[in-house]
Amino acid sequence: MSEPSTPPRPTRILVVDLLGGLGDLVMALPVIHALHRRHPEARLRVLTHPPGDVLLRHDPAVTAVVRAERGRERAAVLAELDRWRPDLVVTTTRYDGIADAIEELAPQSVTNLWRSPPPDEPVSARYLRILASEHVIDPHDVDLTPRIVLTDAERVEGEQLIGAEDRPVVLVPAAGMAVKQWPHWRQLATALAGRAFVAGEPEMLDAWRGGPARLLPPLSLRELAAVFAAVGRRGGVVVGGDTGPMRVAAAVGARTVGIFGPTPAVRYGLGPLGVDLQGLPDCPHRLPTSITEQVCWWEAQCPFSPVGPACMADVTPDRVLDLVPVPALR
């Protein structure tokens, strides 16, 4: 019996990430970079949602980015398959028949990056391990971490936005979901005695106006990434929950302190430069591989507390303060 033939090297690669969250795209960045490293001559396109698409601007691994309209994801995938005819498709997204369509129409594909996840393996690492087993990336690249490319001009702007601060502390209070909201933000900011900056959307900044922290101006996503990069270069720290902006901070080299409650830090942690604080680590209701099926997830109804997620409240301001760098002596 003859050996199965090796598929020809792809010349057109499509990566599909339509899971909906900014953090989901950041966790998929190692997939994009590993594919480019294995197939440097191939053109690589990414189909994703705004606003995260801007994070791929200036990334040399990416030939083009296509934006999908929310609610029309399957149509966007079908249109891209028909228009571009990729040789290889890798998708993080399976809902609405997207995986079936890719398998039917693409010569080569990897459509289930969520298969049999161990409860303690980081999501990005799991993606890469599966792709290596499918022989579409180099096995040596299974340890890649998310990385966002900034221009020199953007980095200069980030330095200017943060001013002359030594070892700056940036707080990212927005949670995205009620179940991830940390109740101790103002206590932390007060304890930092004016050192902290708050980053967020205009509504969040308005809520903090006159409060115990300084406000960064409203920033675009890439401007925010540049500020985070400046924090990293100056030995500062970015503090926040399990959110997309925090993943952006880690991906531009900032040290992070992540506050984790319902999501397990062992799977969704922010990366090697930071520390992830897990509230109520032994919670019996936490489902590491099925977080959206947790009893608390959608309505933030905690079995242990009538006033909000007990796991988030369990992370005290003192635990965070212990990880905040002290300004250098002048």
PLM regions and their residue ranges:
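Nucleotide-sugar donor-binding patch of glycosyltransferase catalytic domains
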Residues: 117, 211, 251-330
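Short loop/helix-cap segments at secondary-structure boundaries that form the rim of catalytic
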Residues: 54-60, 99-104, 204-212, 248, ...
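Active-site donor-nucleotide binding/catalytic segment of nucleotide-sugar enzymes
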Residues: 15, 19, 114-115, 145-209, ...
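A nucleotide-sugar donor-handling region in carbohydrate enzymes
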Residues: 115-168, 284, 297-298, 307-314, ...
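Short amphipathic alpha-helix
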Residues: 25-37, 51-52, 188
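Conserved nucleotide-diphosphate donor binding/catalytic pocket of glycan-assembly enzymes
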Residues: 62-147, 167-172, 263-266
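Conserved nucleotide-sugar phosphate-binding/catalytic loop shared by glycosyltransferases and other
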Residues: 19, 41-76, 280
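Donor-binding and catalytic core of enzymes assembling or modifying cell-surface/extracellular glycoconjugates
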Residues: 75, 181-266
